[in-house]
Amino acid sequence: MRAFSLVTLSPEAFDDFSAHHADGNFQQTSAAGRLRAGQGIEVEYLGVQENGTIVAGALFETHRSRLSTFSVVHDGPLCDYRDRELTEYFMTQLKQHAKAKGSAQMEIVPEMPYCLHDSRGGELPADQGGAPADDAVETLKNLGFMHDGFTIGYTAVPRWRYLKDLTGITDEKSLLKSYDKRTQWSVKRAASMGVHVRELGEDELQVFADIEQATAERRNF
C-alpha cells in the first residue's frame, strides 16, 4: 500500500510543481493566488507527498460571505486522475479540508483533457489521446462529485479548447504554411494593413478591457 501525506506548500514550491506538471496552468500558480488573496479570498497551497516527492497539488480557495462558505480549485487540482489511488486520497483529503473550513460545497475544475480531437472535431486514435477519460470521471463521481455535463457555447468554464500542435514548426514561414489557405490569406491581409501584436503595459489594461467589451457587444456574447 502506498503512503501519501497531505502537506502545505510554499508559494515557490507550488509554482515549481505546477511548472513541471502536465496540466499546470496560470490558475494554479502563486500569481493567481496573490490575485485572489487581494480580493479577500483565503488561499492555500496544498500538496500530496509520496516518498518525499510532491505528486499532486492544488491552489485551494475558501470563499466566505454572509450567506455561505464554499471551496474552489480553479483549473485543478493538478493530479494524475488515471491514478485512482492517488486521486481517491487527494480528493478525500480536500473534501475533509473543505469541511473543516466550514464549506457547504467544494467545486473542482480538473484541467485534464477528457478526449483529444483533430481540427475537424473527429476523435483521435486511442494511442494519440483520443480515448475518453471515462474511468477518471467515474472515479470522481464515486467520490461524491457531480459532473456538470458536456455543455457547449460560451460558459464560464469552456468545455472545448483548441491547441495548435507546433511539432516540426521552426519558424514563422513554416507556421503560416501549416494553416489552411483562408487563414493564410487573413494573416497576410492583416499584415498588409499594418496590424501588429505588442505587449501592453499595466497602464494600458483599460484599453484592452474596452476592446474586449466592444467585441463582446459586437459578437453578442
Predicted ranges, named:
Residues 18-21, 94-98, 140, 190, ...:
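Hydrophobic, Leu/Ile/Phe/Ala-enriched alpha-helical segments that form helix-helix packing faces
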Residues 6-51, 58:
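N-terminal charged segments
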Residues 1-9, 56, 136-221:
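Acyltransferase donor/substrate-recognition loop-hinge adjacent to the catalytic core
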